[in-house]
A protein has these predicted regions:
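C-terminal accessory subdomain/extension
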Residues: 153-264
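Small-residue-enriched segments and motifs
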Residues: 146-148, 207-208
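Active-site loop/helix belt of alpha/beta enzymes
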Residues: 1-4, 9-147, 154-155
Length: 264
């Protein structure tokens, strides 16, 4: 048919792909009969960010077996890939292993760097002795901005936001932003009287989030930033505030923060 595909082998992720052994043999035979070519074979590690992971080592062995099946069938894919951004960053993962495995079927090795293209990568788990290979050099490239919708003053004792979770301790100047959790600004970044929340950047300075983030509105403290006006640019993600900052406050990972940003 002239069609060529990449076949995913489920070596332990348990999500998608064909299992090694008989299921893989059956798929390769069905592809042969249908005239479908094998351009690549790959797998996905479930714990790539964990140093010296026994799970990853077991997956590597299963993938070696699967590539061996491909070789036994006399197939010559162009690509063999099993790496993610965390695989590239994790010093405990043996990069030459993948290269040699690819060579065994006359293929080239490839890594699938996804989140690293945005300048982010999960912290490698495994103790202080583990030195990441690429994470220190990464720089976030995604910027998310909005503009000041309104500016208002509040006096001591006034409350701000739903359920009055924030009470002004003294006079404050607040800026209202036309963005909220419907746009991907996580509600966990809200602040209360007892707990500071997240922040945005206005004029190169931090402006802390005040009260609860609403569906499409957020209040921030600009008391210490001189001359804030309606229409001023506000950085939600960028210089001075990263997806890692949001993730830490929201109890999640930068991947979820970046995927959650929606165009207004």
């Amino acid at each position: 048919s002239g069609v060529e595909v990449h076949v995913e082998v489920d070596t332990g992720m348990g999500r998608q792909g064909v299992r090694p052994g008989a299921p893989l043999d059956e798929l390769l035979e069905a592809m042969r009969q249908a005239g479908v070519g094998l351009d690549g074979v790959f797998t996905h590690f479930c714990a790539a960010e964990v140093a010296h992971s026994e799970l990853t080592q077991a997956q590597e062995r299963r993938f070696e077996g699967a590539v061996g099946q491909v070789r036994t069938k006399g197939l010559s894919p162009k690509w063999v890939h099993a790496g993610s951004s965390s695989s590239v960053d994790n010093p405990a993962q043996d990069s030459p292993w993948l290269v040699e495995l690819a060579k065994s079927v006359g293929a080239r090795a490839m890594v699938r760097s996804g989140i690293a293209l945005y300048g982010y990568c999960l912290v490698i788990e495994g103790g202080a002795s583990v030195q990441p290979r690429v994470r220190p050099a990464l720089k976030p490239v995604m910027t998310w901005k909005t503009r000041v919708l309104d500016v208002r003053d509040v006096t001591a004792g006034e409350t701000v936001g739903y359920n009055a979770t924030f009470t002004a301790a003294g006079p404050m100047r607040l800026a209202m932003l036309p963005v909220g959790y419907a746009d991907g600004l996580r509600r966990e970044l809200s602040s209360t009287d007892a707990k500071p929340g997240g922040w945005v950047m206005i004029g190169g300075q931090r402006a802390g989030i005040v009260g609860r983030i609403s569906m499409n509105l957020t209040m921030v403290d600009v008391s210490g930033i001189e001359g804030v006006r309606i229409g001023d640019e506000v950085v939600l993600l960028g210089d001075g505030v990263t997806a890692d900052d949001h993730a830490r406050l929201a109890g999640t990972i930068s991947y979820e923060i970046l995927c959650g940003v929606r165009a207004g």
